[in-house]
């Protein structure tokens, strides 16, 4: 009996990870197979070969006839049957133990994560989810009341081990029938070589051995029936769960849709006040009035200001001229207003001055532009009488003719950009202003 202790300790683990029918099968295996085989069967088949007697004196004939009658001992055949039938259960136990260890590791990781979350929250107690509470309760329960659920790969392994047990049971029953039949006769006739003729051999305890054979075969049929019942039980359970799933899924979908609609309605309320940072992450739709109130960044004005400063540079002088011919700048409008207040000057003199200014601009280099003689100086001279004005104008004309050829190239480029305009229009504007003064 001590030889079966190792197998018995392993099969006890199967009891914790099996269904009710599986536990009944293990009970049948332990009590009606291992226990009886270890106690009574060995004594019944102990004198098997010594009590096998044949009516011949031919050497070797008795041994040959025994080998033909019993190719393998019944006890050894039943031992092999128990080992082969228990092997799928051992494989399942190995997978179940691995699964249990993985679950324990996962629970330990969840416990560590909960501890870290509680520490990060400043020692506040984190609410325990129902799943985590069930995990703690199941871990705190005793080993005897421990429940084990068959799901996923573990369920597949369990079904496979039942199938293999059934196949081994059927195989050994069929093999037993072809080897011995279902009973042992007291007389066995042998005609195998080296026997000279047909030899009669007699078997000891044939009735007792027949009873043991029938008992062991009945136990094999019971275990086979339990395997079939367990397969049908798991099949019915799977069918029931398959019928329950379509009813449960639409209910879950309806609950999710109702929660989604509630969340949308709460977002629509937040139209008249500024949302918090947490609510801005959830809300995705904003009114059109709020979109237009977005403040522009101060950086947007910088590139345009830099671009406006670069327009007045030397390489873009030609472009500035074309724009100044079409539209007057602020500087030109201010000069025109000042020229209206100037005293009248003869129109014939102004074109000559304009021609000289254009010649001075052509002589100037590309990076610098010449400027016409500022007309603001004319405004500063107060007009007292017409005669005094004429004398002053003639003196200014003489000075302009001398300075236009000498000082035009040395003028600063900043003034050229402001006063670079066609003189023909200035002369017309000045002549109109002077004519208005004369009429008054």
Swiss-Prot record:
Disulfide bonds join 54-201, 61-195, 65-190. A hemichannel or connexon is composed of a hexamer of connexins. A functional gap junction is formed by the apposition of two hemichannels. Forms heteromeric channels with GJA3. It comes from the Eukaryota. This is Gap junction alpha-8 protein. It comes from Mus musculus (Mouse). Residues 2-12 dip into the membrane without crossing it. One of its GO terms (biological process) is gap junction-mediated intercellular transport. The chain crosses the membrane at residues 22-42, 72-92, 162-182, 211-231. Structural component of eye lens gap junctions. Gap junctions are dodecameric channels that connect the cytoplasm of adjoining cells. They are formed by the docking of two hexameric hemichannels, one from each cell membrane. Small molecules and ions diffuse from one cell to a neighboring cell via the central pore. PANTHER family: CONNEXIN, GAP JUNCTION ALPHA-8 PROTEIN. Signal peptide: none annotated. Residues 43-71, 183-210 are extracellular. Detected in eye lens (at protein level). Eye lens. It is found in: Cell membrane; Cell junction, Gap junction. Residues 353-364, 374-399 have a biased composition (Basic and acidic residues). The gene is Gja8. One of its GO terms (molecular function) is gap junction channel activity. Belongs to the connexin family. Alpha-type (group II) subfamily.
